[in-house]
Amino acid sequence: MDIWMAFQALILGIVEGLTEFLPISSTGHLIVVGDLLGFNGETATAFKIIIQLGAILAVMWEFRARVLGVVLGLRSEPRAQRFTFNLLLAFIPAVVFGLAFADLIEHWLFNPITVATALIVGGIIMLWAEKREHAIQAESVDDMTWKLALKVGFAQCLALIPGTSRSGATIIGGLVFGLSRKAATEFSFFLAMPTMIAATVYSLFKYRDILQWSDLPIFAIGFVSTFIVAMITVRALLKFIANHSYAVFAWYRIAFGLVILATWQLHLIDWSTAQP
């Protein structure tokens, strides 16, 4: 196994694990870091699909007790039934819009201006959502109504726009629609499970021809590093938001958006070969 490729896989796995569940756009970070490391092409595309599985498993493991409780309580527990209904309801809009518009959006909007604009605008909205005075309608995910869940589901559709960030769209949407920070964050994590599984399965099918068994060691390094770092990140974020706002992430989004514009203007990143 090539040592340099193993190092690239390790670094990108760490980047994915750090950024997937923070509202700062994992796609944008993987593009920038991947280009700086010279990790592009078909192998890179397949690699990004595989390491998402590591992130999915990390959040499922972190919430395994709740997931198991919901599964076991589906037949008789009203709380588990309501939670599952809300989750599926929030999941549907992304499926419909994704199947209908994902390829068009990828073709027309995957460019540095769109990515940077989405990062900056998302950061500004996040600052506004944190500063505005509003009544909390749901302190926990169990307090959510189906209407709140559906609203967050539609907010998740904005993540189809490159640079928006799936977690960013759902967390910001949750805050805007009246969820507490804790509820918005946890619901974002739970909604990530079906959404990312569906997106990964779709991507695996779409890019099935470029998956090679010879790349398995590289994929394994990225997968494991993503899983470990994502699990640490999820735990750290839940502790952080208990006593802090999302303002630091908002300012980071704005700064990173400006970095994206700079890399484009100065031709530091080859956006013509970048893949979402």
UniProtKB/Swiss-Prot annotation:
Keyword vocabulary terms for this entry: Antibiotic resistance, Cell inner membrane, Cell membrane, Cell shape, Cell wall biogenesis/degradation, Hydrolase, Membrane, Peptidoglycan synthesis, Transmembrane, Transmembrane helix
Record's keyword annotation contains Membrane: yes
Presence of the UniProt keyword Cell inner membrane in the record: yes
Pfam families reported in the protein's UniProt record: BacA
GO terms of biological process kind: cell wall organization; peptidoglycan biosynthetic process; regulation of cell shape; response to antibiotic
InterPro entries: UppP
Disulfide bonds: none
Molecular function in Gene Ontology: undecaprenyl-diphosphatase activity
GO cellular component, as recorded: plasma membrane
Protein localization: Cell inner membrane
Catalytic activity of the protein: di-trans,octa-cis-undecaprenyl diphosphate + H2O = di-trans,octa-cis-undecaprenyl phosphate + phosphate + H(+)
EC number assigned by the record: 3.6.1.27
Primary residence: membrane
Membrane topology qualifier: Multi-pass membrane protein
Regions that span the bilayer: 12-34, 43-63, 85-105, 108-128, 185-205, 218-238, 249-269
Miscellaneous section: Bacitracin is thought to be involved in the inhibition of peptidoglycan synthesis by sequestering undecaprenyl diphosphate, thereby reducing the pool of lipid carrier available.
Function recorded in the entry: Catalyzes the dephosphorylation of undecaprenyl diphosphate (UPP). Confers resistance to bacitracin.
Protein family according to the UniProt entry: Belongs to the UppP family.
Protein name: Undecaprenyl-diphosphatase
Organism per entry: Ectopseudomonas mendocina (strain ymp)
Gene label: uppP
